[in-house]
Amino acid sequence: MTNTSSSDFTLLGLLVNSEAAGIVFTVILAVFLGAVTANLVMIFLIQVDSRLHTPMYFLLSQLSIMDTLFICTTVPKLLADMVSKEKIISFVACGIQIFLYLTMIGSEFFLLGLMAYDCYVAVCNPLRYPVLMNRKKCLLLAAGAWFGGSLDGFLLTPITMNVPYCGSRSINHFFCEIPAVLKLACADTSLYETLMYICCVLMLLIPISIISTSYSLILLTIHRMPSAEGRKKAFTTCSSHLTVVSIFYGAAFYTYVLPQSFHTPEQDKVVSAFYTIVTPMLNPLIYSLRNKDVIGAFKKVFACCSSAQKVATSDA
């Protein structure tokens, strides 16, 4: 028998229908392992291949780190709950999960905005690119993204966990997402919800402003390019980033900006599952499948491993 505290929460989980639980568990586990593996491989390739030692790939390695931590914040607990009869999460663990979730998602918001700036410099100021995106500036940009995300976590987590909760402590979700947790509050949360709304709008508005400005200038530059080859190369440089931005920001807009009257618990779970489970797997695939440098680096590492294995076999 599991000992529970009166301050603990119960996560109702992703599914109501237990008949499909086995299939869903297998799919989520496969996606989780695939996402972690793909992102770790991406980080490894960027570190070992000198062709990938560029500002764009440095920022991409930061995205892979964020995605790995992001999916590890929610999915292991979800998988454990799916095989366990007890779906308890302690008050402290819930607070930690909220903080890590807010930090990772906030950092990713800012990083995607900074990656748009990187695209802008690469397309619009290619001759000054090494100066404008030198190592020191890349480190500062990455640190700024992490700081912005952690600021969101440090601001909203203490307020959320200090709201009085009483009565039912069953969270109709598969992790401690703030909107689902606040539904259990036994006090007026309108002021806090307004504060959260403002924070989320700012977290979206600042990066979206950078993205919109960057791509407006990129489109103007592409329009002026005389050659079709140059235009194609410019579009290729930015297309992967635009795809990731559309997926990630679309889901975030639904969750945190769209009024609650447009939400249902089941829809919220589906959208949350998409951007907490699926998106971290899609990001490395989107960037690698359409990128000759990444594919080339992977083939090079694979060839080296194959050669080493053949040498080891022949020596044996």
Curated annotation (Swiss-Prot):
Q: Which GO terms of the molecular function aspect are on file?
A: G protein-coupled receptor activity; olfactory receptor activity
* Residues on Cytoplasmic side: 47-54, 118-136, 217-233, 290-316
Residues linked to a glycan? N3
Pfam families, alphabetized: 7tm_4 (PF13853)
Q: This protein's superkingdom? A: Eukaryota
| Cystine residue pairs | C94-C186
> Which terms under GO biological process does the entry name?
detection of chemical stimulus involved in sensory perception of smell
Keywords linked to the UniProt accession: Cell membrane, Disulfide bond, G-protein coupled receptor, Glycoprotein, Membrane, Olfaction, Receptor, Sensory transduction, Transducer, Transmembrane, Transmembrane helix
Under the heading PROSITE patterns, the entry gives:
G_PROTEIN_RECEP_F1_2
Q: Which residues lie on this side of the membrane: Extracellular?
A: 1-22, 77-97, 156-192, 257-269
Q: Classify the protein's membrane topology as the record does.
A: Multi-pass membrane protein
Q: Where in the cell is it found?
A: Cell membrane
* Segments crossing the lipid bilayer: 23-46, 55-76, 98-117, 137-155, 193-216, 234-256, 270-289
Q: Mind telling me which InterPro entries this protein's record contains?
A: GPCR_Rhodpsn (IPR000276), GPCR_Rhodpsn_7TM (IPR017452), Olfact_rcpt (IPR000725)
A Gene Ontology term for the protein's cellular component: plasma membrane
Q: Which CDD domains match?
A: 7tmA_OR2T-like
Q: From which residue to which does the signal peptide run? A: none
The role this protein plays is: Odorant receptor.
Family per record: Belongs to the G-protein coupled receptor 1 family.
What name has this protein been given in UniProt?
Answer: Olfactory receptor 2T11
Native species? Homo sapiens
Tell me the gene name: OR2T11
